[in-house]
């Protein structure tokens, strides 16, 4: 998602703030989608950033990309003076996982909730190890079955509960 739509008068794909693509901002957008129940839309943003990352050295996301339209079989246009890697961009994939899977934590209830989890198209399975809530820890498997995601707790220490909301 660009900082400004390509249809806006001030759009400039090489502008720092007027048409560029920021991984950090996209993770925040995905988080907002997830908060309002749009897990598949959050996963779609994840797909776009993953695709961009495949063209970056060691898949380390930079501060931003130029906002030129996507071109088949080509990576994004790198912003000439972007920090790469960039710390807040490095955190974006973790936030995107949380947003796509609808992960929530209730420490008082020792509960990890997974609300309508979705996997991006590039992932058919995902394993998260050592998710902590209070003093408890849980390993969880996520597997795509058609258009659904099956959630299976693998290992648990302590009294944490895993609740899936379909």
Placement of each model-derived feature along the sequence:
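Extended glycan-interaction surfaces of carbohydrate-active proteins
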Residues: 1-21, 54-77, 94-95, 101, ...
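Long, well-ordered core segments of solenoidal/helical folds
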Residues: 8, 39-58
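Well-ordered alpha-helical segments within folded domains of soluble proteins
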Residues: 19-35, 83-98
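Beta-rich accessory regions
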Residues: 33-44, 115-166
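Hydrophobic/aromatic-lined pockets within catalytic cores
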Residues: 34-38, 50, 54, 97, ...
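Catalytic cores of secreted or luminal carbohydrate-active enzymes
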Residues: 79-129
């Amino acid at each position: 998602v660009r900082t400004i739509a390509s249809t806006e008068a001030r759009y400039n794909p090489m502008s720092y703030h007027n048409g560029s693509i920021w991984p950090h901002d996209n993770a925040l957008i995905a988080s907002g989608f997830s908060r309002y129940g749009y897990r598949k839309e959050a996963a779609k943003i994840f797909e776009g950033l993953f695709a961009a990352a495949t063209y970056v050295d060691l898949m380390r996301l930079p501060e931003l990309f130029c906002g030129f339209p996507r071109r088949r079989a080509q990576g994004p246009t790198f912003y000439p003076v972007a920090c790469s890697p960039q710390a807040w961009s490095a955190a974006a994939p973790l936030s995107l996982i949380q947003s796509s899977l609808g992960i929530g934590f209730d420490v008082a209830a020792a509960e990890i909730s997974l609300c309508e989890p979705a996997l991006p198209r590039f992932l058919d399975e995902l394993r998260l190890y050592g998710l902590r809530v209070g003093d408890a820890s849980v390993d969880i498997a996520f597997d795509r079955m058609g258009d659904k995601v099956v959630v299976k707790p693998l290992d648990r220490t302590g009294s944490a509960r895993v609740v899936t909301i379909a």
